[in-house]
Structures are given as structure tokens and as C-alpha cells.
């Protein structure tokens, strides 16, 4: 999108040169606010789904349910093949911030003080706590082996914010490492 027709055309030309628009066609929106809303809604949706899966992974932890097996069974249905596995938190340069950024923009740029986003806010809070929970599980596992956290050598694998990506920005495992280091574990 762009604020004028010429701006939209220039954006399309530029993006067509740097993106594979054959495989990933561009969708041109009428206004920049629509383009930004697409991005923020998509990322807030995914963050909300991951927060939802956090609820069910905690249920599974407590009741001995193999959540991986459950998700694999659900994925058999073509309409449910995109269900996500819960992890130690959301990361990357978009998911952790976009829900809050959208709310900020609505209040400060669009001057709308009436709208509230309770689901998005809850998802942000749940996802922010997931890394701490993973660190607590690590502490519990060490305690079960009669090993104090202080001085325990802990290897953290899978440090990117999602599988098959080499980018570690705002990774959930970063919070785990910080929390365990605060408790004097050797990372």
C-alpha cells in the first residue's frame, strides 16, 4: 500500500524486484493502515494460538498427557495441519511486539481510547511468562536429580525463535538462559 496511487505502484515495483511474487503474490491494500493491520492481525493471531497451546501444554504436563502425540493426531486432518507445537516462548522480531504495537498505534496514532483487546493482551502476558515456566521446569528436573541449580551445567539447544531459522532475536530460550543464569546455573 501507499498513501497515493504512485506510492502504491512504486511499492509494488520495489517488492516485485526483491520478493518471489510468483510463489508469494502481493496483495495490494488501499491504505497503509490496512497493510499494517494485516501484519499485526496475522502475528497477533499466531501469538494467540501459541498462548492457547501453552494452556494445553500445562494441562498435559500436569496430567501426563503426551501433547506432541495429541498434536500429531490432530494434524492428520487437512484442515488442522497447521496447529503449532508449544515452545518456551515466542520470539523473532515480529510476534513478541506486534500485538502491543497494534494496541499502541490504535491509541496514539488513531486516537482511539475506546477499543480494548483483552484476548491479545492475555496472549502477550501468557507468552511473556512461557520462558520463565520452562526455566522452572528445568529447575524441577535438576531437583529431581538431587542437583542444585547453582553450579549446574545446563546446555540450551534450539536457540532460534523457531525451527529451521538461524535468527535468535527475542527467542524464548534467551529468557530461559537469563533466568537460569540468575539462579547461578552455568549456561
Give a label for each model feature.
Residues 1-187:
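Structural/interface elements that position substrates and couple domains in central-metabolism enzymes
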Amino acid at each position: 500500500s501507499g498513501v497515493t496511487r504512485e506510492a502504491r505502484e512504486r511499492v509494488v515495483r520495489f517488492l516485485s524486484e526483491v520478493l518471489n511474487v510468483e510463489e508469494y503474490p502481493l496483495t495490494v491494500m488501499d491504505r497503509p493502515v490496512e497493510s499494517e493491520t494485516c501484519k499485526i492481525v496475522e502475528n497477533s493471531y499466531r501469538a494467540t494460538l501459541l498462548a492457547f497451546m501453552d494452556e494445553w501444554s500445562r494441562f498435559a504436563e500436569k496430567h501426563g498427557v503426551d501433547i506432541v502425540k495429541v498434536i500429531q493426531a490432530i494434524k492428520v486432518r487437512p484442515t488442522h495441519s497447521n496447529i503449532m507445537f508449544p515452545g518456551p516462548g515466542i520470539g523473532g522480531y515480529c510476534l513478541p511486539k506486534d500485538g502491543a504495537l497494534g494496541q499502541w498505534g490504535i491509541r496514539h496514532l488513531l486516537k482511539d481510547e475506546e477499543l480494548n483487546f483483552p484476548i491479545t493482551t492475555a496472549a502477550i502476558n501468557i507468552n511473556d511468562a512461557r520462558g520463565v515456566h520452562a526455566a522452572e521446569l528445568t529447575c524441577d528436573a535438576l531437583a529431581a536429580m538431587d542437583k542444585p541449580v547453582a553450579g549446574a551445567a545446563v546446555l540450551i539447544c534450539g536457540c532460534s525463535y523457531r525451527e529451521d531459522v538461524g535468527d535468535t532475536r527475542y527467542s524464548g530460550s534467551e529468557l530461559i538462559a537469563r533466568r537460569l543464569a540468575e539462579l547461578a546455573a552455568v549456561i
